[in-house]
Amino acid sequence: MALACLNSLNANAEIFSFDTRNSLNSDTLVLFHSADSTTYSLDFLPQSTQDQLNLAVADNSFSGKRGEVLEILVPSEIDAKRVLLVGIGDAKTLTPGEINALGGNIAAKLETVPQATVRVLTQGLNNAPLFGSELAHGIELRSYRYTQFKASNRVEKNYQIGVDDLSLNQKHHKNLQAVEAGVFLARDLTNAPAGNMYPESFANEARKLKSLGVKVTVLEAKDIERLNLGALAAVGKGSERPPKLVVAHWPGSKEAPIALVGKGITFDSGGYNIKATGTSIARMKSDMAGAATVLGTVKAMAIQKAPVNLVAIMPMAENMVSGHAMIPGDVITTAQGLTVEVLNTDAEGRLVLADGLWYARENYRPSVIIDVATLTGSKVSALGTVYAGLFTDSEPLVQQLTFAGQQVGEKVWRLPLDQAYDDELKSTIADLKNTGKEGSAGASAAAMFLKRFAGDQPWAHLDIAGHALTATDTAVVPAGATGYGVRLLSTWLTQPKAQN
């Protein structure tokens, strides 16, 4: 049974089918080899072919290390144009994310191959019953392309994956494709130029989720003024394009909702604290990646009809320079009533999140709030791009989000929330200021700012600065927008006791 990929319009769909056959006929045959010298699915091959494979492994010093790929001469008994032997390391310890990466490596290896059919044999991997479906997930994630302004000449591949448990892999793959749809939405939104993706156009993309049963509400500038969302209004007032507050609600259960709040700065010039020209400002179309992530997560849950009550709050604005723009030294009033002295107009993300957090608390009474934002360069200095920064006082959230991140390869690392960083936010003329001390731990100071608005329920802040875009291909992400966080949050939402 072939399962079509639920890709966004800008992604090139691969075709997948799962079966339990031992067929070897294909343009490309893929086999797997572990670090303990086990080649899986060998029983399907003639003895002479097995001998040739073992000889190729020995001659090429192929260790079976995870991610290692060896292309070997095609044995005469196999009707294929190429055979790939893929190392999986220790099969007993593979995480889903590591299997995804193997799939991405295969997709990359076959990117320029003109032949379409690929036969993948995963039978015998008893410690990874979902290996086939997770492998397909990685292939699909890597095969995404943003083609709005550039045509793709990729050859669509037809992957035929042999598995031990057909029903289990088909069902799991269907759920993974829902997650892919969310990832691809987030990538599409983040890849789009800021001239095309601004608060109103983002809201229009969110409205498309109504067809999936998502309740979408868009607060216009007049609504923002009426509700006293003063921080969001202040950040957006320098642009000709007014700010919005976008809400996407998937009512998949009657439990108290989980709220995701995503920073949605569709272009960040820095305001009057303007960013340096060059690569830094050119990347600032991606400052809405947090909003893209939480909207993509809602889409993923809606497609698989997940039994979770999930609401995404996305404060959207452009941070621009004009005669109407916020200027350094301004004092603004947030929806919560706290006044903020704006000492740096380029520390605007925490301002829109403050009103977003307040709106989530006041209107949905959530059991948990997680905000997602490309917030601080300080986080990149501390952790680089291997880990996202996790800030929370909730030990269950630390454990759950850390585990979910390890499972899918979107890892998080806990950073400190400390009163000392809150003390840095004291202002002589307002309740607080929007920056800490120069040269201090900026990511922690920003998190302490957000904590003022997060409420008493469990809350976590994910600083994904450095993760929104990648300049080079990685295992499951082609160069461009990553959709980082959709897989992490989707796994967290669907794992047991995620709402505790």
UniProtKB/Swiss-Prot annotation:
<feature type="binding site">
    <location>
        <position position="263"/>
    </location>
    <ligand>
        <name>Mn(2+) 2</name>
    </ligand>
</feature>
<dbReference type="GO" id="GO:0004177">
    <property type="term" value="F:aminopeptidase activity"/>
</dbReference>
<keyword id="KW-0378">Hydrolase</keyword>
<dbReference type="Pfam" id="PF02789">
    <property type="entry name" value="Peptidase_M17_N"/>
</dbReference>
<dbReference type="InterPro" id="IPR000819">
    <property type="entry name" value="Peptidase_M17_C"/>
</dbReference>
<keyword id="KW-0963">Cytoplasm</keyword>
<feature type="binding site">
    <location>
        <position position="287"/>
    </location>
    <ligand>
        <name>Mn(2+) 2</name>
    </ligand>
</feature>
<dbReference type="GO" id="GO:0006508">
    <property type="term" value="P:proteolysis"/>
</dbReference>
<keyword id="KW-0464">Manganese</keyword>
<dbReference type="GO" id="GO:0005737">
    <property type="term" value="C:cytoplasm"/>
</dbReference>
<feature type="binding site">
    <location>
        <position position="268"/>
    </location>
    <ligand>
        <name>Mn(2+) 1</name>
    </ligand>
</feature>
<keyword id="KW-0645">Protease</keyword>
<comment type="similarity">
    <text>Belongs to the peptidase M17 family.</text>
</comment>
<keyword id="KW-0479">Metal-binding</keyword>
<feature type="active site">
    <location>
        <position position="275"/>
    </location>
</feature>
<keyword id="KW-0031">Aminopeptidase</keyword>
<protein>
    <recommendedName>
        <fullName>Probable cytosol aminopeptidase 1</fullName>
        <ecNumber>3.4.11.1</ecNumber>
        <ecNumber>3.4.11.10</ecNumber>
    </recommendedName>
</protein>
<feature type="binding site">
    <location>
        <position position="348"/>
    </location>
    <ligand>
        <name>Mn(2+) 1</name>
    </ligand>
</feature>
<feature type="binding site">
    <location>
        <position position="348"/>
    </location>
    <ligand>
        <name>Mn(2+) 2</name>
    </ligand>
</feature>
<dbReference type="InterPro" id="IPR011356">
    <property type="entry name" value="Leucine_aapep/pepB"/>
</dbReference>
<feature type="binding site">
    <location>
        <position position="346"/>
    </location>
    <ligand>
        <name>Mn(2+) 1</name>
    </ligand>
</feature>
<dbReference type="InterPro" id="IPR023042">
    <property type="entry name" value="Peptidase_M17_leu_NH2_pept"/>
</dbReference>
<feature type="active site">
    <location>
        <position position="350"/>
    </location>
</feature>
<feature type="binding site">
    <location>
        <position position="268"/>
    </location>
    <ligand>
        <name>Mn(2+) 2</name>
    </ligand>
</feature>
<dbReference type="GO" id="GO:0030145">
    <property type="term" value="F:manganese ion binding"/>
</dbReference>
<dbReference type="InterPro" id="IPR043472">
    <property type="entry name" value="Macro_dom-like"/>
</dbReference>
<comment type="function">
    <text>Presumably involved in the processing and regular turnover of intracellular proteins. Catalyzes the removal of unsubstituted N-terminal amino acids from various peptides.</text>
</comment>
<dbReference type="Pfam" id="PF00883">
    <property type="entry name" value="Peptidase_M17"/>
</dbReference>
<dbReference type="GO" id="GO:0070006">
    <property type="term" value="F:metalloaminopeptidase activity"/>
</dbReference>
<dbReference type="InterPro" id="IPR008283">
    <property type="entry name" value="Peptidase_M17_N"/>
</dbReference>
